[in-house]
A protein has these predicted regions:
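Catalytic-core regions of hydrolytic enzymes
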Residues: 17-152, 167, 171-172
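Polar helix-capping/helix-linker motif
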Residues: 155-156
Length: 174
């Protein structure tokens, strides 16, 4: 997977330089998923939190080396837990143009292949919403999630309605 990511990004960087294109992004936040006492997916020889951190740091280095006018920020650069609301605060505080969250899947397959990419956009909005709800369940693992998120419970059925309303309002305003 990592090899594929490097090839894909290298091709994109070369194309961007050849075309002399102007980057649409001035500030990018790279979020290494999980961390600290939240390992994410656990394999026989690795933990998601370690893989996401390594990939995030390499991606940031590639962007910095090839796109000199783009500022790269990270939600974490060491193995520590950063609560979900703080990750979004980092991006909002600097007015980031792009937020990239790196995650890995687990598989019982002995020779897994492939990758998944999710991008919030106007197509497949329902699928994007389901992914967001799944990722937001990590909120329940935080020590003070009731205080940090004003009592928000990602499992409460009424939140499906609220998520849909917010998503529709965001899409209409985009």
């Amino acid at each position: 997977f990592f090899f594929f990511l490097i090839i894909l990004l290298s091709t994109w960087f070369c194309h961007a330089q050849e075309e002399g294109s102007i980057n649409k992004f001035d500030k990018i936040v790279i979020d290494a998923g999980h961390g600290g006492d939240k390992p994410g997916a656990v394999g026989a020889k690795s933990k998601e939190k370690d893989i996401t951190l390594a990939v995030s740091l390499k991606l940031g280095k590639m962007i910095t080396e090839h796109l000199k006018d783009v500022e790269v920020y990270y939600t974490r650069v060491i193995d520590k837990d950063v609560e979900l609301y703080k990750r979004s605060q980092i991006a909002n505080k600097i007015s980031a143009d792009l937020f990239i969250s790196i995650h890995c899947n687990s598989s019982s397959n002995k020779t897994p292949k492939g990758s998944e990419t999710f991008a919030l956009g106007v197509t497949k909005a329902a699928q994007n919403l389901e992914v967001a709800k799944k990722e937001n369940k990590d909120i329940l693992l935080e020590a003070n999630y009731g205080d940090n998120y004003d009592g928000f419970d990602p499992n409460a059925p009424e939140n499906d309605i609220l998520f849909s309303l917010f998503q529709n309002a965001y899409m209409e305003g985009s």
